[in-house]
Amino acid sequence: YVPIDEEGEAASKTLEYAFDDWTIARMAQAMGKGDIAATFDKRAANWRNAFDKDTGFMRARKRDGSFRTPFDPSASGYGTDYTEGNAWQYSWYVPQDVAGLAAAHGGSDKLLARLDEVFNAKVDPSIFEHMEDITGLIGWYAHGNEPSHHVAYLYSYAGQPWRTQARLKQIMDTQYADRPDGLAGNDDVGQMSAWYVFTALGFYPVAPGSGEYILGRPFLPKTAMRLPNGKTCLLYTSDAADEEDS
C-alpha cells in the first residue's frame, strides 16, 4: 500500500495501483508469461490493505500499518487521503474483484445495503464547494467525477440487476441533457460521454482489460455497431424508454 505519511492521496492510489497491476497481469497472461501474471495478480489484491473491516470503508494507512485518524468518510480535499473524492466515493473501486469486495463487507446482502446508503444519503452539495471536481451528486454518488462511474452496476454483481437498471435510468435522466451544461462534470478523456454511450447500448466494461461487459438496460430501440471484422452487430430492444424496470 501507499503510506499516507509519505505520500498524499494514498488511499485512492493504493486502490488504483491494485487495478493497474491486475491489468498488467491480464496482459502478461495473454502473452503466455504466467510467472509475471502471478506476480501482478498477487499485487492486485493490495486493495485489501486499504479496507477497514470495522468501518467498511477504504482508508489510508501509515507506514506503521495503522489507519490514519481521525477519520471522516465525508471529508474531501486536494492532496488528502483520496484524489478528488472521499471514502464514500472511493470505497467501491475494486472493479477487478467485486466478489472479493462483497465478501469483505460480509456478503452480497451487506454490499447491497452499503450501496443503498451511497445513493439514498441526504447530502448537501455545498460541502463540496471547495472541490469543483465533485459534481452530479445522487446521495454520495458523484457522477461528475469518474471514479464513481461503475458503482451503479455493482447491484448486478450482488444479484439484483433490476436495481442496477433503476439506478442507470435515474442517472441518465438527471445527469445528461442536450444543452450547453448537459454534462454533470468534465469529460475527462471522454469518460462522461463513454459512460453514456455504453449505458445507452445496454452494457458496460466495469473492469476494463477483462474483455467482459456487465449487462444494464438499453436506452435505444435499435443500435448498429460496425465491428473491425467488417460485420455489423445489431441490437434491438422493446420498451426501452420509460417502462417500469423489472
Where are these regions (language model features)?
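Active-site core of glycosidic bond-cleaving carbohydrate-active enzymes
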Residues: 1-219, 223-231
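Single conserved hydrophobic/aromatic residue that forms the stacking wall/gate
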Residues: 236, 240-246
